[in-house]
């Protein structure tokens, strides 16, 4: 892999920025398609909303990375915190901040939050999958050494090389990209069936949290935080638990409401 596409003067054009931008762009395109297919006219808001959540998500992803993953470095390099083009974005923080921004946007425009979220959820994970290619090209979010003669060898300009040298590393970013695409397929499959509002989004949170929790055992770019677990694993456990409880709550209510409707519709 290569970090740089070219240099314009002394300014580097990084593959990280290109693939990160492509993740946002193609995520918005997919969201537009899904919402237009849904037929409720919400697709007209995609690009305005996309700009909003992209901006807020970048801020959230950066702050999450700085304070939960790399504070040991950044507390001595505070001026580098805004340098997002160098890499260092936490997906979990980006998604959380983006969801908060999206909630207020949808409320302002009187768009039902849960149906909208369910419809665009596959686009979110699709954008994440492309974003992991950015991490791979940049040599961050890397795995720890495999301890064998197989694995990924990163260029000497990357953080992965500066951390572990010329040791083969587990392809953590590649596995997450592949896992995201599998989750995308499962979400599209689930959307084909009748289900309670909000459960598609909850399913996304649960599946991604599980994927992230187990992949963190292979990550080598930061250490454990508590109980032998990393910060992303603790966040994943909390996210999975909350999403599961909400999924069950929504599903039970949906079944109860459906039963009432069927009962009221029976001839007497």
Regions picked out by a protein language model, each given a short descriptive name:
Residues 1-268:
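A feature for loop-to-transmembrane-helix boundaries and adjacent hydrophobic helices
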């Amino acid at each position: 892999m290569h970090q740089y596409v070219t240099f314009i003067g002394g300014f580097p054009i990084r593959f990280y920025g290109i693939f990160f931008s492509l993740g946002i762009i193609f995520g918005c395109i997919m969201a537009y398609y899904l919402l237009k297919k849904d037929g409720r006219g919400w697709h007209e808001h995609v690009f305005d909303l996309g700009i909003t959540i992209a901006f807020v998500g970048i801020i959230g992803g950066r702050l999450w990375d700085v304070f939960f993953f790399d504070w040991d470095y950044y507390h001595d390099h505070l001026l580098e915190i805004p340098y997002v083009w160098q890499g260092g974005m936490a997906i979990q923080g980006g998604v959380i901040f983006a969801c908060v921004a999206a909630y207020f946007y949808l409320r302002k425009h009187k768009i039902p939050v849960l149906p909208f979220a369910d419809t665009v959820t596959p686009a979110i994970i699709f954008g994440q999958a492309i974003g992991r290619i950015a991490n791979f090209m940049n040599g961050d979010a890397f795995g720890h050494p495999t301890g064998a003669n197989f694995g990924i060898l990163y260029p000497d300009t990357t953080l992965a090389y500066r951390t572990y040298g010329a040791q083969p590393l587990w392809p953590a970013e590649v596995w997450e990209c592949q896992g995201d695409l599998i989750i995308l397929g499962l979400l599209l499959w689930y959307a084909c069936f009748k289900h309670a509002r909000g459960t598609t989004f909850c399913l996304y949170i649960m599946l991604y949290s599980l994927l992230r929790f187990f992949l963190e055992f292979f990550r080598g770019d930061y250490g454990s935080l508590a109980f032998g677990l990393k910060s992303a694993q603790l966040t994943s456990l909390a996210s999975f638990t909350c999403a599961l409880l909400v999924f069950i709550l929504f599903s039970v209510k949906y079944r109860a409401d459906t039963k009432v409707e069927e009962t009221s519709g029976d001839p007497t």
